[in-house]
Regions:
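Short hydrophobic/aromatic patch on the recognition helix
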Residues: 48-58
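Short secondary-structure transition hinges
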Residues: 96-136, 168-172
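Hydrophobic/aromatic residues within well-ordered alpha-helical segments
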Residues: 19, 72, 76, 90, ...
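All-alpha amphipathic helical-bundle segments outside canonical DNA-binding/catalytic cores
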Residues: 125-129, 146-161, 175-178
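C-terminal peripheral helix-coil segments that are non-catalytic and often amphipathic
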Residues: 1-7, 135, 139-150, 165, ...
């Protein structure tokens, strides 16, 4: 293969990666402003590409959301590892993990709904993301259960759904600044077998 031919073959891949990265940047801004139900065609227009280019990279909204959340996974993983490293009390560790999960689930307005629906849709790229979060929640939960700090019948999947419900309620029209701590307390008293003081944030 000649150098000229090689350069021609590399250029489309480079351009495609550049387009993909640019679309993700624009989509993050658009969803931050309009929520996850924002128009994909509007994202394409704002990115200066045709709808076909966007859909070649991201065939549907779930694929686009999964790509955006993938970019945030490093932060969530870092918080998980810090909790494991710094917190000795398994019940407090679970509490802090649920708080980190709640912050992740509120990255964009309306995000809890597609996350809630994803596990039931086996083909959704968000399903794998959710399963990873549930698996980690189970690990923290089981440690708290062994320590007597969480009720034995509670499941990680239920806590994950509870976090999504609280995250959704935070954005409800009737919610105010007192809603997040009140809702977190309600979730906490649902799983805790003894009183747990809210973690210092």
């Amino acid at each position: 293969m000649s150098e000229t031919t090689g350069a021609r073959e590399r250029r489309p891949r480079t351009d495609a990666q550049r387009n993909r990265t640019h679309i993700l940047d624009v989509a993050e801004q658009h969803f931050a402003e309009h929520g996850v139900t924002g128009s994909l065609d509007a994202i394409a227009k704002r990115a200066g590409v045709g709808p076909g280019t966007l859909y070649r990279h991201f065939p549907n909204r779930e694929v686009l959301l999964a790509a955006l959340l993938k970019a945030r996974e490093d932060e969530l993983v870092s918080r998980r590892d810090a909790i494991r490293r710094e917190v000795d009390d398994p019940t407090e560790a679970l509490d802090r993990w649920l708080d980190a999960l709640g912050r992740w689930a509120t990255a964009f307005d309306g995000l809890p709904e597609p996350l809630r629906a994803a596990p039931a849709e086996g083909t959704s790229p968000l399903a794998l993301t959710c399963q990873g979060c549930i698996t980690t929640t189970d690990e923290f939960l089981q440690a708290a259960q062994r320590d007597g700090g969480a009720r034995p019948e509670v499941r990680g999947a239920d806590l994950f759904l509870g976090v999504l419900a609280v995250s959704w309620a935070r954005g409800a029209a009737m919610a105010d600044e007192s809603s997040p701590p009140a809702l977190n307390t309600l979730l906490r008293t649902g799983w805790a077998s003894r009183a747990v003081e809210p973690s210092e944030r």
